[in-house]
Amino acid sequence: MLASQRDLFQMPRDTCYLNSASYSPLPLRTQEAGRAAVGRKATPWTLEPGFANHQHERARAAAARLIHADAADMALIPSISYGVATAAKILTIERGTRVIVLENDHSSPVLEWHTRAGAQGFAVETVNRPDDGDWTSAVLAAIERSGAAPVGLASISSVHWSDGGLIDIEKVGLALRQRGASFLIDATHSAGVLTMDVRRLDPDFVLFPTYKWLLGPYGRAFLYVARRHQGGIPLEQTAFGRRDVRAENEVYFADVSYLPDARRFDMGERDHFISMEMASIGMEMMAEWGASAVAQRLLMLTERIAEGLRGFGVSAPERSVRAPHILSLGFENLGFENLGFEDGMPAGLIEGLATEGIYVAPRLGRMRISPHVFNDEADADRFVAALAKRLRG
């Protein structure tokens, strides 16, 4: 099993950080690269002419490696919302069809379609959170529902951000392909941790940022665009998205036809000297460890926590329907009325744990625990002991 990588991070022993699904800490290597990059921007005359392009292509290749894509199929973007807006501009959603989204999915893969539905004549259908936590069956039932309008698109996360609910994207993708529907995957909480092979899966779009599981900075994200969509018009019109629009040319607009691959969809002002290399380092580290090894380690930690809390009245999704790296705890039936707890998470519980140097997140009335490779068994045991003590009063 992959060992704890704590020594690669600025992680004090008395800090128990279990909130990587919000923000992951930066590895020491990434911090060093960021400091060097600030110095580089301070002395721009030292930059080699090809430096920026090298940074772009290094990041593009690192992102592609995580999902088994070709680098030419990856666009550099600043956020998931930017990527979804790009996909929405490229796609034609037929009138009278449905766009499938998840209840309380993050805003990016949802709101774009609500905004466009009226003008474009399609309906947005929300798949409600299933009582048994089985998102895959619920999504498939919505796609396959007899008598419903055809599905034009499913725009969903592969792992639900709030509780780690896992969607089997291979099963969903197959059902969509059989109906000629498009598939957009927000892989924010799966890229680098869960194996994804776009060659086999054949989605239309896959998006992910670096600031959570990929150990990178905020503001760097990536968009996979299937080749069948690479003739689309980009969200922004840039010189570098065209074949030959260069300041060095005698004729500036020498060839304004678009690049033939996903590079045409790169964001404007992509020369982020400081954060682009930082993003590359985190993605490269994740790829070197391997998604299977990372998932195995994090499953060990979340299972250790779940097992340690048995008998304390908290609920957690069944292992079969949750991602290995996120554990969500519910407090609906604590049975501690004599302690003044009402149904739901006790008030001040998250804040109280933080006073002990233990960091988790409140999400939709539940507690979300999200360890990463810097965590170890001592962190898991410390969290269990602290939470158990507070629940006992």
Question: Predicted segment positions?
Answer:
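Pyridoxal 5′-phosphate
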Residues: 1-393
